[in-house]
Amino acid sequence: MAIQYWEDSLSAADVQALRKNFTATARPALAGLAGGESSGSYLNEGDLLEPNFQVTFFGPNYARLEKIKAVYDPKDLFIVPVGVRSEFWDAEGMCTK
């Protein structure tokens, strides 16, 4: 288990730097120990910086979830960062790539 915390008084830029460091160093190290990228991750909420969120958060279910989303939301009206099909949207969720 890896833990990253910060004081509430820390600036937003410093918090972002801590999150980036965790995503770039601790998470890959833990994935290597746990048997690879399909081992999963949990940071109290989906880490917006997670580079492989499809596998990390959804695992083998991602393809099936894409099909379900295509039925109920064919125009991708409902999107969230690091959610199903969010990789086709810009970082602000305003425009498709």
What do the predicted segments below correspond to?
Residues 1-97:
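Cofactor-binding catalytic cores of oxidoreductases
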